[in-house]
Amino acid sequence: MFITLEGGEGVGKTTQQALLAERLQREGYACVSTREPGGTALGEALRELLLHGDPLTPLAELLLYAADRAEHVNKVIAPALAVGQVVICDRFTDSTLAYQGYGRGLNLEQIRQLNHLATGGLQPQLTLWLDLAPEVGLARSRLGDKLEQEHLEFHRRVYRGFQALAAAEPQRIVRIDAGGSPLEVAARIWSVVKPRLLAAVPRP
C-alpha cells in the first residue's frame, strides 16, 4: 500500500510519518519511510539545491522535482511496493500541483502530464492531507528553507491548492485536522489508515 502525507509548511508531516511507521511496525507490517525531494542519492542532492540553493525559475524548479521523483519511484517506491511493503512518503505529486501549480502559477495540466511521466502513472492509494492554516504552520516551522521564506500569500495559494485537490479526489485525499498534540493527530491518522490498510494489505 502506498500512503502519502501532504500539507503546507509546519503541519507536522515528518513527526506524523515517524509515528505512523512506528504504529505499522508494532502491528506487524513491513514499511518503508521516504520523502520528496530526497529518498535517493540524487534526490538528497536535489533537495539541498531546491531548498537551500540559489533561487530557481519556477520551470527549472518543477523539472528538478520531476527528476527527483522519477529516480525515487524507480529506485525506492516501486521496488518496495513490489514486495508487499507499505510505503509512507512525505510529499509526492500533490505537493507539486499545490506548490508549483497553485503557488507558482504554472499550468496544472502540464504538471499532471509531467507527474505521470515521472511516476509511470503510479498514484498513492491514500493521501493524508494535514490541514493547518498557513499562518499557524509557518509560526510552528523552524527550518527556514527557501519555501518557508516565501511570502504569506504564496502559502495561502498553496493551501487553497490542497483544498482544491482534496475536493477533487475525496476518496484518495483525506483531510486530517493537524491541530492539537502530535499524539492526537496520530490517532486521527490511524483511524483513517487502519480500515484502508486492512482492506488493501493482508494481515501479517
From Swiss-Prot:
List of residues binding ATP: 7-14
Gene Ontology biological-process annotations: dTDP biosynthetic process; dTTP biosynthetic process; dUDP biosynthetic process
Keyword Magnesium: no
Gene3D superfamilies linked to this entry: P-loop containing nucleotide triphosphate hydrolases (3.40.50.300)
Keyword annotations of the record: ATP-binding, Kinase, Nucleotide biosynthesis, Nucleotide-binding, Transferase
Pfam family, any one: Thymidylate_kin
The enzyme's E.C. designation: 2.7.4.9
Function statement: Phosphorylation of dTMP to form dTDP in both de novo and salvage pathways of dTTP synthesis.
Family of the protein in this entry: Belongs to the thymidylate kinase family.
NCBIfam families noted in UniProt: DTMP_kinase (TIGR00041)
Protein name (record): Thymidylate kinase
Originating organism: Synechococcus sp. (strain JA-3-3Ab) (Cyanobacteria bacterium Yellowstone A-Prime)
